[in-house]
């Protein structure tokens, strides 16, 4: 505790909406944090060593990524893991995945336009729309004994609304855990292109897969589509 980490100090409010008066049936040391975004595994030595090396420079000013090596490392990872390549000028840094999502929704959608996503959904897709006073449109996934699939007829119907200008995809899907197959992504891509929509593909959890699963970036399926934004995060890679 006393780290200001969500994993140790913030989970009571974040998950349980609890204040300091709420009593939990277990002691803190008995909890094992295994939520997808913040598992209780130690940071690798190579990362710790890199931070220590940076600390030794003793100068901490405004920071941006200026070195080509960052792009080279990230691009090499995407090529080796997903056989996916992209131009260096298309890699843009942000101050965080959630702030970037909020900013993109407000930038892409005009005040009278709508945001479409699959439900159940990562809650911040709706929060981002709410923050910009944009309407949310939900296309419910089909639940067959815990295996979720896309209702393409419903998705296409809702995407056809000219006021629905942005589709947010979660790939792999949160919270169902579905890793979308290539044919599924192609069908999604066809609907997006047909309606000339913007699409944000949230691929944050792309490397947290079971051994028999394979992540396919939407950008690999739609390599020439100019209204596609892929969200990724190096700290989970």
Per-region residue spans from a language model:
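N-terminal small-domain helix-loop-helix segment of the aminotransferase-like
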Residues: 5-96, 103
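Walker B catalytic acidic pair
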Residues: 203
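Short, active-site-adjacent cap segments at secondary-structure transitions
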Residues: 41, 206-207
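Conserved small/polar residues in nucleotide/adenosyl-binding loops
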Residues: 233-237
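Metal-dependent active-site segment of extracytoplasmic phospho-/sulfohydrolases and closely related
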Residues: 197-198, 209
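Conserved core of the PLP fold type I
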Residues: 60-190, 207-208, 212-225, 229-230
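A short beta-strand/loop micro-motif in the catalytic core of glycosyltransferases
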Residues: 116, 198-199
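Walker B beta-strand of ABC/ABC-like P-loop ATPase nucleotide-binding domains
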Residues: 168, 199-200
